[in-house]
Amino acid sequence: MIAPPLIFGAFAVLAGIGMFRDDPDALPSAREGQPAPPVVLTEFPGKKMFDDETLRDGQVKLVNYWASWCAPCRAEHPNLEALSGEGIPVYGINYKDQLGNADAFLAELGDPYKAIGRDEQGRMALDWGLYGVPETYVIDGQGTIILRFAGPITQRVIESTIRPALEKAAGSN
């Protein structure tokens, strides 16, 4: 009866390889490698808006979905400010939020966004395949999604995931 232990052992090895092969935090996205969906946003009063043409302006950029009620959005905000301070264009999409709360959030923490719009009903988020906030996309200069990252942008994520995607996006321009 050596066959059952060998079969079990082989299965255990394959399962172990499968578990450690991919990033367990990475969520699949059918959008990567595809053109960004249409930008259909409501104006954020007092802020510059962006549109489809902005995503195809020849410049690599980040698009960040956020909300004032989102604790991880608050946690990632200093990292978005730092990326913006480095000259990386960051475009914000305020997701299903009260305007006053969103405005207070930016007044308190700072505004890292080159331009911003509001997705009040979450309809645009459906087209983008949003899982939840925060969520950040790396977009190349032709408007192609290079990376979709679900979750807060930490310093580790910037170095291991965002910067390599920005470099890849710059190479595809």
Give residue spans per PLM region.
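Short gly/ser/thr-rich secondary-structure transition/capping motifs
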Residues: 21-23, 42-49, 116-119
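C-type cytochrome heme c attachment motif
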Residues: 68-75, 135
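Structural microenvironment flanking redox-active thiols in thiol-disulfide oxidoreductases
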Residues: 74-110, 119-126
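A short beta-strand-turn-helix
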Residues: 39-62
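Thiol/disulfide oxidoreductase modules built on the thioredoxin-like
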Residues: 107-112, 119-170
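Short pre-active-site segment immediately N-terminal to redox-active cysteine/selenocysteine motifs
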Residues: 59-61, 66-69, 132
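Hydrophobic beta-strand core positions in alpha/beta domains
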Residues: 62-64, 92, 138
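N-terminal targeting signals for export/organelle localization
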Residues: 1-42, 173
